[in-house]
A protein has these predicted regions:
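Serine-hydrolase catalytic machinery in alpha/beta-hydrolase-like enzymes
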Residues: 5-113
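Active-site loop signature of alpha/beta-hydrolase-fold enzymes
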Residues: 36-37, 65-66, 152, 174, ...
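Hydrophobic anchor at the start of a short beta-strand
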Residues: 55, 118, 165, 195
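Alpha/beta-hydrolase-fold catalytic nucleophile elbow
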Residues: 60-61, 121, 145-148, 168, ...
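Primarily recognizes the serine-hydrolase "nucleophile elbow" in alpha/beta-hydrolase
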Residues: 108, 116-162
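Short beta-strand/loop motif that positions the catalytic acidic residue
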Residues: 166-169, 173
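C-terminal catalytic histidine-bearing segment of alpha/beta-hydrolase fold enzymes
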Residues: 179-225
Length: 225
């Protein structure tokens, strides 16, 4: 069982199970989807550590109970209006981004790691938050990953950046359309960001082994120091 760790005001399972080194040198902070919690993604830790024995996985629970599932959590409210006017969620996303960044800073302090050793990723709503943090946040992570997510709002062009993104999506996603990630890729690249895009044929709203492999490869490249 992974241990539960609290950083800032967020808590969730922390996975680091290896006999090869004493403590992690890199961390993937992975944000769950709407109505789930951190335990939903913690099982990915073992697969990631087969690829990168020095990486830990921290899966914090969202800061608020899910409005449609009180047993789950959410990063921001996802009402029916969201699908017509997603930009209306931006003020709450900004507030949540501050909470996530404070947690990541506390994590780095505790593990004595620089932000360049951290990748922030997420699935579905968590992926939306990861893309938001990468384009509007202040915590300078090594990279940002969105799995079956979407980019909310306008991206400000950047003149020079080393920040990279991993964007993956199943072509048969019935919850968040595949086109959302294709649009995110286009908007990010137009703004000047580096994007690794992975389309997963016939995959619905989920994470398969190929996506996990792609995420692991991205984490490895992004955190090369």
């Amino acid at each position: 069982m992974p241990e539960n760790r609290t950083y800032g005001t967020l808590e969730g399972p922390f996975v680091f199970q290896t006999d090869e080194i004493d403590r992690p040198q890199k961390v993937l902070v992975l944000l769950h989807g709407w109505g789930a919690d951190g335990h939903d993604l913690a099982s990915l830790g073992e697969g990631l550590q087969h690829m990168m024995p020095d990486i830990a996985l921290w899966c914090p629970h969202g800061p608020a109970p899910c409005s449609a599932n009180p047993m789950g959590r959410q990063w921001f409210e996802l009402s029916e209006r969201f699908f017509q006017s997603p930009e209306e969620a931006l003020p709450e996303m900004e507030t949540t981004a501050d909470v996530i960044e404070a947690a990541c800073e506390a994590l780095c302090d505790d593990l004595d790691l620089p932000p360049s050793s951290v990748v922030i990723g997420g699935f579905s709503q968590g992926g939306m938050m990861a893309l938001h943090l990468g384009t509007k946040g202040h915590f300078e992570a090594a990279g940002y990953a969105s799995l079956s997510g979407a980019l909310i709002g306008v991206v400000t062009p950047v003149a020079d950046t080393s920040i990279s993104f991993f964007v993956s999506h199943g072509t048969d996603d019935e919850v968040v359309p595949f086109a959302a990630s294709k649009q995110a890729q286009a908007d990010l690249e137009e703004a000047g960001y580096l994007v690794d895009f992975m389309a997963r044929p016939q995959l619905g709203h989920g994470i398969d082994m190929a996506t996990l492999d792609g995420l692991g490869q991205f984490c490895y490249k992004a955190t090369l120091i």
